[in-house]
Amino acid sequence: YAKILLFGEYGIINDAKGLSIPYNVYRGAFQPSAKADNAEKAKKSNASLGAFLAHLKMLRADGSLIPNLDLDRFEADINEGFFFDSSIPEGYGVGSSGALCAAIYDRYGIDTINPEENIDKDSIVKLKAIFGQMESYFHGKSSGLDPLICYLKLPILIHSKTDLGTVTIPEPGTGNGAIFLLNSGQPGETQPMVNIFMEKMKNKGFRRVMKEEFNKYNDACVAAFLKGDTK
């Protein structure tokens, strides 16, 4: 699945609360080359998987790879022409790289944490560390939150970097109000925007606004949404 970070964008970097939910309108899965609708796109995806595999092999070689992955099987599939067939738009913040990392862990992981079983906080923190390392290949640095949502397919409430857990969100109601996605038509890269935010955080005035104003209203939005209070 894809994901949507409803509340906490950038704020979670500064320990504001965050609420992220899976978004099943978009999804992705590994497919053999024979099932490709677009041969050129499949070839490009296959090449990207090969580059990612090389990165994972390098981490394994220096002993720093956190997840236990069957990289030999991954390599065999790549050599057979496998690609990641995804409807998730890239560069729109809905978890395209996160879904890929989750799919790799799900397909090639050994002794994985089963998302169908009861997931406790320790399991979530472990998964977050695994996915954070994997997705860092794409963004330079990753919290691991996006692939975590994609893998668990459950809403996650983030209190801090190490305090997070699954949560139940209110059932959809009836009326005129709704949360919706608006396609800006302007894809962008995550890392440059994070860099801009971190640069702004060096400013004392900006840090004060984030701490005293943004975090307060952001956390209030999360609490109200979970209670179903949308007025």
State each model region's role.
Residues 87-99:
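Gly/Ser-rich catalytic serine loop of serine hydrolases
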Residues 99-111:
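Stable alpha-helical structural segments in soluble proteins, enriched in small hydrophobic residues
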